[in-house]
Each structure stands twice: as C-alpha cells, then as structure tokens.
A protein has these predicted regions:
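A residue-level signal for conserved active-site and pocket-lining positions in enzyme catalytic cores
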Residues: 94, 142, 213, 312, ...
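Active-site glycine-rich loop that binds ribose-phosphate moieties when present
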Residues: 135-145
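His/Glu-rich zincin catalytic helix
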Residues: 1-35, 143-248, 285, 369-381
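Short, low-order "capping/linker" segments at domain edges
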Residues: 99-103, 197-208, 313-324
Length: 381
C-alpha cells in the first residue's frame, strides 16, 4: 500500500491513488471466466488474500487436489480483467470496508499513532485508502499498477507441506508466462527522524482505554538477519510476559493480558510499538519509558538475556511445525532479503554484547508518541 509513488527503470515518477494495491487485490479474483473463489470451491481449497504495507499475498490451503488449486492460483494472478463497470461496483464494497475500519478502535489507535510519528511516509495512510482516494481508481490505473508490480521478477511462490519441489516446478513452468525484467524504484519523500507530535487521543465506544506507545527509529535501523535476531531478543527480554517490566506493569494494574509489543518495519520506516488496554495509559507509557532508561543505564541482566535467547530460538523452531507459518515466513524473508535459517543461526550465536548494541541505538524515549483511544464521556454520546 505504501508504493503509491514509483518509477520504472529510468522513467518518470508515477503517482497512483492511495488504496490501489488493496483494490487490485479485490479485483484480481474476478476474471472473464468467473470468480476464482468459485473455482477453488470445486477443488475444496480454502483461499484468501491480504494486502499489507509492503506486499500483497494470495494464498490457499488444501488437503487434496493441490495441483488443481495451484493451477487456479497461477492462472488468476496472471489474468487481470478490469472494466469501468466492475471497478465502479467495487468502490461501494471497499468504501464500506474503509468505514468499518474507521469504527475499529484497535485500528484507529494504531493509525493515529502513525500519523503522529511520520511526517511524510505513506505508512501513516490506511492500507485501503480513503473513500475519496478510491473514487479516483479506474480500470486504466489498475492495469498500470498491475503491469508494473505483477511481474514475475517482483513475485515469489512459497509452498510448504507434503508436496515435492519437482511437482511444483512442473506446474509453474507450464503456466507462468515470461516477464521482461524491470527495475522498480519506490519514491518516498524525505522523512525526518523526529516524530510529529508526542500525544494524540480519540474518544470511542470502548469500555477501557487502549494505547499504542510507538518509538520512531531510523528507517534502516534493522537490516539483515543478525540485527533482526538481536532486536527480537531485546524486545522479548524487555516486554515479554516473563520480563520484569511486564510484571511491574501488571502489579501496578496498568495493563492486562492484551498487552503486546512488536517491531514494525518495512521500506523507509521502522518503529517499536507497545500497546494494549490500560485504565491509565499515560502512567503505563511513563513506566515503559522509565524502565528503558534504567535498562540503558544499568545494562542487560545476563540471566534475562539467556532466557530471552532460548525462548526466541525455541519459539522460532516451534513455528516451523505450521505449514501456514512457514509459507508466510518464507515470503516475508524473501522480500526483506533475509534467510530464515540464517536468522535462526544468528539467534543461536547471539551474545549479550550484540543485544546491548541494539539497545544502545534504539528506543529513544525522547522520540516516541503515545496514542490513546478512550471511552466516550457521559453526555457526549
């Protein structure tokens, strides 16, 4: 969704409406031959798709007729069919989806935070766009975006499960059409390191306040498997359910089981987010920031480091028991230029000094923003 300004090879910069990647995902399931979901129903496969900030994924799972389902996938993603009538029909559907997300407190608390964090980067814009931006989408613009990004050189096929490589390659070689290789340049405006504003709140129909505390990082803060592994260990020892910070927040009745944390990064953006429900979100945010300051002053406890390292290693290896997770991880790592098995090795080989370096260059308490969604006050409903 963030690729709304781009150029191809050495051409001019092209600007397309916000939300067009998500719109294209919806429309690609339709073709002159019918709906791809109807075709999947005939093979018994469970199909879906999603658009994130940096990629669109089309997926299916099945227990039988894998070859037929793979043929459906490889066929419809290469067979766009857009007309003025079908595009106009979709605008109402996606418009309702946008309004639905506008009424979702978890969604709003995150995007309010991103708007407070990023001056120019399009990551602050809703993946689905706005009702106004999708009104600008035409069949011609969909074809333009499709022809640039839906190129085999910009795509990856990830398969996991009880199937052989030879079987997959045989189907792929038969159905995939050769593509001329182009270089796609994403165009982002200069993004300052500093946040926009330190605080934002919005009233919602919620029973308890929800907060997101976001620490803005440099865009290239986490590069490669080693830095990714060291960052994951750092965040686990900082805020997992076994951490001292988590226990302090819980004992102070400032969080509940909804509390979470994540590294949120992609092309041109990077941040660390803590969030969940809290009766006193400002106090929770202050406790998190104070703990980070003390951790930087006092250093990382060796025992806590070892627990975090072993936990991240175990969780990562255990995740490989899920075929769904494997496929998603493979796709994520491919587009980031990382390798899943190298990442696991980096976890195993991580030292407390490696993780301390991550701590020293991240989590600037003077460059964070707090977003709060709070209950509507009496008399304002």
């Amino acid at each position: 969704s963030i690729n709304t300004k781009f150029s191809v090879d050495d051409g001019e910069t092209i600007t397309v409406p916000d939300g067009i990647a998500h719109y294209l995902e919806h429309k690609l399931f339709e073709s002159e031959d019918g709906d791809a979901f109807v075709r999947y129903a005939q093979t018994g496969a469970n199909a879906n798709a999603y658009t994130s900030f940096e990629k669109t994924c089309y997926l299916f799972s099945c227990t039988e007729k894998f070859d037929e389902s793979l043929e459906i996938l490889l066929d419809f993603v290469q067979s766009p069919y857009f007309t003025a009538q079908t595009v106009a029909k979709e605008q109402g559907i996606i418009g309702q989806e946008i309004k639905m997300y506008d009424d979702a407190p978890d969604w709003r608390v995150m995007f309010n935070m991103l708007e407070n964090m990023y001056h120019n980067h399009p990551v602050k814009i809703d993946i689905a766009g706005t009702v106004e931006s999708i009104a600008e989408i035409t069949a011609e613009k969909l074809y333009e975006v499709y022809n640039v990004f839906y190129n085999l050189n910009n795509m990856v096929l990830c398969v996991s499960g009880n199937v052989t490589v030879d079987k997959v390659l045989k189907t792929a070689d038969r159905l995939l059409k050769s593509s001329e290789k182009h270089t796609i340049h994403n165009v982002f405006e200069n993004e300052p390191y500093e946040i926009v504003k330190p605080y934002v709140e919005q009233e919602f129909s919620v029973s308890m306040p929800i907060f997101n505390l976001g620490f803005k990082e440099k865009a290239d803060c986490v590069k490669g498997d080693a830095q990714a592994a060291h960052t994951d260990i750092l965040l686990f020892l900082l805020a997992s359910e076994t951490s001292e910070l988590y226990r302090k927040l819980l004992d102070a009745n400032l969080i509940n089981s909804s509390f979470s944390y994540e590294l949120f990064d992609g092309p041109g953006y990077c941040s660390v987010i803590f969030g969940g429900e809290s009766r006193e979100p400002q106090k929770a945010a202050e406790m998190i920031k104070d703990y980070i300051v003390k951790l930087k002053e006092n250093g990382i406890d060796k025992e806590e480091f070892e627990i975090a390292k072993k936990s991240i290693y175990g969780d990562t290896v255990a995740s490989l028991n899920s075929v769904d997770t494997i496929s998603n991880i493979l796709a994520d790592y491919h587009f980031k230029g990382n390798n899943m098995f190298d990442y696991i090795d980096e976890i195993a080989n991580a030292t407390i000094e490696d993780v301390t370096k991550r701590l020293d260059c991240m989590l600037d308490v003077n460059n964070c923003t707090l977003s709060v969604v709070k209950p509507i006050q009496d008399g304002e409903k």
